[in-house]
Structures are given as C-alpha cells and as structure tokens.
Swiss-Prot record:
Function summary: ATPase subunit of a proteasome-like degradation complex; this subunit has chaperone activity. The binding of ATP and its subsequent hydrolysis by HslU are essential for unfolding of protein substrates subsequently hydrolyzed by HslV. HslU recognizes the N-terminal part of its protein substrates and unfolds these before they are guided to HslV for hydrolysis.
Places the protein is found: Cytoplasm
Name of the protein described by the UniProt record: ATP-dependent protease ATPase subunit HslU
Cellular component annotations (GO), alphabetically ordered: HslUV protease complex
Pfam families found in the cross-reference section: AAA, AAA_2
Family: Belongs to the ClpX chaperone family. HslU subfamily.
GO BP term, pick one: protein unfolding
Alphabetized UniProt keyword annotations: ATP-binding, Chaperone, Cytoplasm, Nucleotide-binding, Stress response
Annotated CDD domains: RecA-like_HslU
Gene: hslU
Organism placement in taxonomy: Bacteria, Pseudomonadati, Pseudomonadota, Alphaproteobacteria, Hyphomicrobiales
Self-association and partners: A double ring-shaped homohexamer of HslV is capped on each side by a ring-shaped HslU homohexamer. The assembly of the HslU/HslV complex is dependent on binding of ATP.
Amino acid sequence: MTSFSPREIVSELDRYIVGQRDAKRAVAIALRNRWRRQQLPDALRDEVLPKNILMIGPTGVGKTEISRRLAKLAEAPFLKVEATKFTEVGYVGRDVEQIIRDLVEIALAMTRERKRKDVQAKAHVAAEGRVLDALVGANASEATRESFRRKLRDGELDEKEIEVEVADSGGGMPTFDIPGMPGSQMGMINLSDIMGKAFGGRTKTRRMAVRDSYDVLVAEESDKLLDQEQLTQEAIRSVENNGIVFLDEIDKICARAERQGGDVSREGVQRDLLPLIEGTTVATKHGAVKTDHILFIASGAFHIAKPSDLLPELQGRLPIRVELQALSKDDMRRVLTEPEASLIKQYVALLNTENVTLDFTDDGIDAIADIATSVNSTVENIGARRLHTVMERVLDEVSFAATDKAGETVTIDGAYVRKHLGDLSKNTDLSKFIL
C-alpha cells in the first residue's frame, strides 16, 4: 500500500478537487494511519482499529470524487458502493456481505497483477516457445526454430496469423442465484467453475495475430508459475489489513420518523452494516475474511434525512465527522480552470480534434460560474454538476457546427455566454426544466 505522507496525499487530491480541505485531511490521515499500523509490533497492531469516517455535504461538492482519486492513490483493495444497492437479508436484492466478497475479488486481481510482474521474464520465454510451436510445429529442427525466433524478436512476424490453444474461461456459461437462499449467501454460482474443476481445464483454439497472442499467452504462462493458494491467502490478508470500502449515498437508507411505508428494509440494511463495520467474519468462496481492520468511509448529502436519523449504533461506528462546504461562485470558477483535467481543458481538447480553437476569456469564465451559481441558488443546488449542464448549453452551437469551422478560433467571452444563456438563466420557470 502507499506510504505517502498526509501532506502529499492532500496535495495529490488538490490536483483534481477544489477546496474541501477538512475532508481531504481526514482521508489523508486515515490512509496514513493504515501505513502506521503496519509498522507496529504484532500484539499492538491487532488492537489498533481504524477510525471510520462519515462525510456530510450537499451533492456535487466532491465527496464521490475524493473516493475515486483515493482509490488510485491507495494501492490497496478499494471498493466504492452505493448503499442503496443493498437490501436487508430476506428481501430480494444484494446483502451487505457481498461488499466483502467483491473486495476480495478486487484484491485477488491486484495481487495476481503484481505477482505476474515477478515471473514475467520466465512467462515471456514460455509464451515465445508456444508461438514458435504454432509457427513451425513442435517437431521442427533447432536451426529452424532459431531462425524463426530471430524473425519473431525482430518483429517480422507480428502480423502473421497463428492458431494457439488457450484456456477456455467459460465466460458464456450462465450464472444463477440459489433459490430460497436469502440474499444468495453463496453468491453467484458459476457453472463453469464447477465443470472446470470436475473435468480439468478445458482449452479452445483461437486464431490471432502473433503480436496479439503474446498478451494472452504471457498471462496464461504467468498463472501457471504462480502458487494460487499463496496468492489467495495474500489477497485475503491484504483485504483484512488494508481494505477500504467507500459507502456512498448512506443518507438514502435512513428511516425517517415522519415517513412510514416504502422503507421496509432500509433500517434493516443499517442493522446488517453494523457487524460488518464493527468487525465480523464473512465467508467467501476463497475463505473467511475478518472485517475488523477494514476502513469504512461513508458519505451522504443528507438533504432530507439528518445524520442523527442513522441508527445510534451506526453513528457510533462512524466516529470521524467531516462536513463538506457548498461551492461558492469563486469555487465554481476554480473548478472550471484549476483541476488537472478541468472542464475547460476537456472541451478545448475535444474541439481541437476538429481543428477548432476555443479561447475562454476571464469574463467568459466568470459569466459561466456566475450563471451556474445563481441557478443553483434559485432552482436546486447540485454543486459542480451544474457546470456540465451550463457548459453544454454554451458550447452547443460550436460543438454542432465544429466540422464546418475547421481552422477557426471561437472566443467564449461574457457576451457570448450571456447571448446563449442570459434569458434562460433569468427565467426561473424555464431554467427549472432546461438548466
């Protein structure tokens, strides 16, 4: 996992997310504490539990974006899920233990990818041997093989088509739930898993270019060199010690006192989450996984419900509270220009492919930020997401006629923005439907 300092994590998040210093600091400290715990002696390490986080803030201010960027930074098994996808055990839908099963699958893929790099050289030699077998036959003389090996390494045979035997992953086999099992405790049973184990690995012949065959064959040869048992144990260990789960939309599973009916299994989802966050053992097809040291970061807009509407026990298991601020006009302006892949940079690059140059002036950017902020305050505050709608409206004409404007420069200034949006943003009734 990553050994970045909290300051480095915050500065990395600053490249993509505007403001929200408190939230960035909280996740940076939590991530660094994962690393600190690994440095402790064994006896103390088991006692140090992660301090789970609850992020509260209106929609479109960066809660989900923080989780996405954190996933890339963490170099640890990371899963982002919406709490609304899950139902109480006994109802149709996914039960919360599926979160841990999915996390194990992610950890397995990460561990396998890392281990493959260690055996890549050996796997490449074995893959080259299989390509030569396909080109000249297994019984060809050594001189012939050497001659073709040289051509192969020089790239002369890259486009030649060959037939190779590869393992059949059985992706076309159906999956099904086990009837009568609440929440499908066994998860999805894959028929090909059962058949593969019963009849040994099946293979199929695939026809492909030499260049394309290397990726498939190197991956296959790498897997033969790996100890699958050890790989699985390492993945489970990684989940137990470094796993991070980001639970989005947690406010949507609050059962509000004044509203009855329709919320039949919402509080049940919270009850099911309790043992998972507190620490329990979840059975997966790869083995048992303890959740004591998995870090949970929950987030929600809490527009209608309040954090106090969560079950008291669940509130207690999310001790660190971070409030994210609504975006001001100045923040909107920064969102348009500062992030590494800001909206303006994206649109400039997109239209550049048609040889059209977009030139955004300062007053043009101000006008876009101003209109987005005023619509947010009069209609519904959806944060930075409003900028997508406004930008699409402003650039609608240019985007449509871009193919006829090759070689031209289009200046987006305040007058241009007001011409395309002015009346719309002033008319509240219209902007409710259009912006």
